[in-house]
């Protein structure tokens, strides 16, 4: 091959056998192909061609260095070692579209615990230095180790060191980085496209009372009042606002109730909130949660007017403390507003727990 070009086809047919793959190891590239090339020895199957790295782009190399007709993931070629710029000592690896930039440290290649060469990794950047754009093209440049051996081996390169450094050969392997994706190509996720999970996780609020029952309001109100035990005085204003909202809620209804409960007592204009604001920090809270659980469970399970259940509940109340002591929801001053008493007076015909109020 005097023209230094690899022609693997004769009359349109490949010279290599079908299924031929060229996948040499690093040791084979250095110890066989590159060493024979440096020593001008004949290579049995000369499939690696010579390439001027400054005249070919990475995407052109895969066409020039193709071996056979089978698909390839990497391409091999010989190139001049450390070709310098005309007016300097820096290695010239620039092409028309970009440049090859070395990255990292050189890796030592060994054979049988013996150093035979080095591998340099380079990345192709599009544009001009130092503002090039990194691409997915990678090149491994293999060169023989021209350091004098001190272990007595005889196969040291016999050429002039200066001539070898300036006019030597390297064997290169070019490939594309796997799973390479640009950040600009990734789909952008906006906040508007995300599902609104926060709204679904929120519990019922006082501003949306259409799908919330009166019992839910009572439970939520009791839970908030129970937390006043550890609440500082600076948060009493917020608690007072919750109390006002609670007064505007619809009253409880029994399952058999067909007529709405009179809500005239819930009108904000007829309520005087000044005692509530004055006594907000002195109001006792519900501390017996066991009694509250029993009361709620009884109302849910025994909401119908069942004389047997009512009688058993009355007997249980007579044997224990009064519900006034268990709940501690009434205020000591009779002149102040009693929310629970007003609630029971208005729903006396519907509330099965009327006898529990004092």
UniProtKB/Swiss-Prot annotation:
It holds the Pfam family NAM. InterPro entries: NAC-dom (IPR003441), NAC_dom_sf (IPR036093). GO terms for cellular component: nucleus. Its main location: nucleus. Stems and roots, specifically in interfascicular fibers (sclerenchyma), cells differentiating into vascular vessels (cambium), and xylem. The NAC domain includes a DNA-binding domain and a dimerization domain. Transcriptional activator of genes involved in biosynthesis of secondary walls. Together with NST1, required for the secondary cell wall thickening and lignification of sclerenchymatous fibers and secondary xylem vessels (tracheary elements). Seems to repress the secondary cell wall thickening of xylary fibers. May also regulate the secondary cell wall lignification of other tissues. Binds to and activates the promoter of MYB46. This is NAC domain-containing protein 12.
């Amino acid at each position: 091959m005097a023209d230094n070009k690899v022609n693997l086809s004769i009359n349109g047919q490949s010279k290599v056998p079908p299924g031929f793959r060229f996948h040499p190891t690093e040791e084979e590239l250095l110890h066989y192909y590159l060493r024979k090339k440096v020593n001008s020895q004949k290579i049995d199957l000369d499939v690696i061609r010579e390439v001027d790295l400054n005249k070919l782009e990475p995407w052109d190399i895969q066409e020039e260095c193709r071996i056979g007709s089978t698909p390839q993931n990497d391409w091999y070629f010989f190139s001049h070692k450390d070709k310098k710029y005309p007016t300097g000592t820096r290695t010239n690896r620039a092409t028309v579209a970009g440049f090859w930039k070395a990255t990292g440290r050189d890796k030592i290649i060994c054979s049988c615990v013996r150093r035979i060469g080095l591998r340099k990794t380079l990345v192709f950047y599009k544009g001009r230095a130092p503002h090039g754009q990194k691409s997915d093209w990678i090149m491994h440049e293999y060169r023989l180790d021209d350091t004098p051996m001190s272990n007595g081996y005889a196969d040291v390169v016999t050429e002039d060191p200066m001539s070898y450094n300036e006019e030597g050969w390297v064997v290169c392997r070019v490939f594309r980085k796997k799973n390479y994706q640009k950040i600009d190509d990734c789909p952008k996720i906006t906040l508007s496209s995300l599902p609104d999970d926060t709204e679904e996780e929120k519990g019922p609020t006082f501003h949306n009372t259409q799908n919330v029952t009166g019992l839910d309001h009572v439970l939520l109100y009791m839970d908030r009042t129970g937390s006043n035990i550890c609440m500082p005085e600076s948060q009493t204003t917020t608690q007072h606002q919750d109390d006002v909202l609670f007064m505007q809620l619809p009253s409880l209804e029994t399952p058999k109730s067909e007529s709405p409960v009179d809500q005239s007592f819930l009108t904000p204009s007829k309520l005087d909130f000044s005692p509530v604001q004055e006594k907000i920090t002195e109001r006792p809270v519900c501390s017996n949660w066991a009694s509250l659980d029993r009361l709620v469970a009884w109302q849910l399970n025994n909401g119908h007017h069942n004389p047997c259940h009512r009688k058993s509940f009355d007997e249980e109340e007579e044997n224990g403390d009064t519900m006034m002591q268990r709940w501690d929801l009434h205020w000591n001053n009779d002149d102040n507003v009693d929310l629970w008493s007003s609630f029971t007076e208005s729903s006396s015909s519907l509330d099965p727990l009327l006898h529990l109020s004092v």
